[in-house]
Amino acid sequence: MAGAGSRRERTAVKRGVPDRGDVLHIDLDPTEGREQRSKSYVLVLSPADFNRFGLVLVCPITQGGGFAREHGFAVSLSAAGTRTQGIVSCHQVRTLDYKERGASWVETLPEEIVDDVLARVRTLLD
């Protein structure tokens, strides 16, 4: 994953295709149960090659996240030097149609944060 402001990043954003590590502002409704609701920030986990089909695999970013914090499924953004703050809830992975949900690009997170999130998601699958 390239750093913020890289040529790859600008091209992907210009094409309107999010890439792994991008933060999007997106409408998460409709939701059920404990799923995060309304217009929220999400971290894109899937690569641009997949996302070009109109779907993204994401984890929500929240200011709460009690369960995620207590059980090791939270990655904090507080010391990441990013505009987006809160925690990435690694246990609430979902696939979204970013075009239909009116997603807008916010920023790209540092590679070490994205790698930490991916590692925690993998523990759910192993």
Spans of features found by a protein language model:
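Conserved functional hotspots at enzyme active or ligand-binding sites that engage polyanionic ligands
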Residues: 1-126
